[in-house]
């Protein structure tokens, strides 16, 4: 029996039903370069900077053209039986399915593009090696959080992993957009010569001095960002929703204004919301209509801020969290 959708979903579906008949060519000029002429479905939601589709992710990815998008963020099922869309019979079946959509993701990425995949370390460890045949390199990132209780009788989970696949050696990475605050020790001694014994000076005396970068230190491969929780304005009922702060870091790192961001498992819309905040073009796909209704509501109620204000917003939140520990 089909799952019943909420009244909110039905109301939002009625509000956007008139967009279903719009053609892709008429709705967004850049779509002509991204979608093949054989695309089967029309967008469920159209906005100036983006499109949202209700469709199966793998089939939908096949409708996108080669070398057409700048960045893909994917938060696929984790094979942990957490929802009715996460019911693989075995890890082998899960890996084979994952490689199918990853190959399509690699195909549609521009040579300078990146694919970020979020998941549990034990799954991504099985996936990384076979997926590398589609990419030039990969960086393993850690999203660490402190605000989840350990409700079991085992090691409590306090992180998820993110694989950063790069299609070529000439991938985009905007270091200055994602710099982090220096430590108190560094700021206490802001200018100093490299000591003769320093590993960075090769045992040679140097008269040159090091000074902190005005935007902060270079980013590390561990991000400490809380999970979404009750009381946060962005929180929805989605069981695996990712925080906007995490997506802002990744999108700022690997794209620029006007780039095309794709999320083939867009869920409650965090990637789309953040792309809209940061003045990127975006295209999302999610087969669950209720999740799409939550995404649409979030996109329609975005608080207007400049990119610089969003960066400052996240830095101030990070400092606040540090100060109350």
Predicted segments with their positions:
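Core catalytic lobe of class I
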Residues: 1-34, 39-294
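Cysteine-dependent PTP/DSP-like catalytic domain, specifically the C-terminal lobe
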Residues: 290-325
């Amino acid at each position: 029996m089909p799952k019943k959708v909420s009244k909110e979903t039905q109301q939002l579906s009625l509000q956007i039903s008139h967009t279903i008949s719009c053609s892709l060519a008429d709705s967004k000029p850049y779509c002509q370069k991204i979608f093949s002429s054989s695309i089967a479905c029309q967008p469920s939601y159209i906005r100036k900077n983006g499109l949202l589709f209700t469709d199966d992710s793998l089939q939908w990815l096949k409708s996108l053209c080669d070398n057409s998008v700048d960045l893909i963020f994917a938060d696929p099922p984790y094979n942990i039986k957490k929802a009715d869309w996460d019911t693989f019979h075995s890890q082998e079946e899960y890996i084979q399915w994952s490689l199918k959509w990853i190959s399509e993701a690699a195909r549609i990425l521009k040579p300078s593009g990146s694919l970020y995949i979020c998941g549990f370390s034990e799954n991504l460890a099985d996936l990384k090696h076979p997926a590398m045949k589609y990419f030039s390199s990969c960086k393993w990132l850690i999203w660490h959080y402190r605000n989840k209780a350990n409700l079991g009788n085992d090691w409590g989970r306090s992180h998820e992993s993110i694989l950063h696949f790069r299609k070529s050696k000439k991938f985009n990475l905007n270091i200055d957009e994602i710099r982090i605050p220096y430590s108190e020790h560094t700021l206490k001694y802001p200018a100093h010569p490299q000591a003769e014994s320093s590993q960075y000076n090769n045992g040679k005396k140097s008269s040159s001095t090091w000074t902190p970068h005005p935007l902060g230190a270079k980013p590390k491969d561990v991000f400490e960002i809380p999970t979404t929780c009750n009381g946060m304005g962005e929180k929805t009922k989605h069981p695996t929703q990712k925080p906007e702060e995490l997506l802002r870091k990744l999108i700022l790192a690997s794209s620029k204004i006007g780039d095309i961001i794709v999320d083939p498992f867009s869920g409650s819309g965090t990637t789309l919301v953040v792309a809209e905040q940061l003045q990127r073009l975006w295209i999302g796909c999610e087969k669950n209509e209720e999740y799409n209704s939550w995404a649409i509501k979030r996109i329609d109620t975005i608080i207007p801020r400049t990119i610089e204000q969003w960066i400052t917003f996240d830095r101030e939140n990070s400092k606040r969290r540090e100060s109350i520990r």
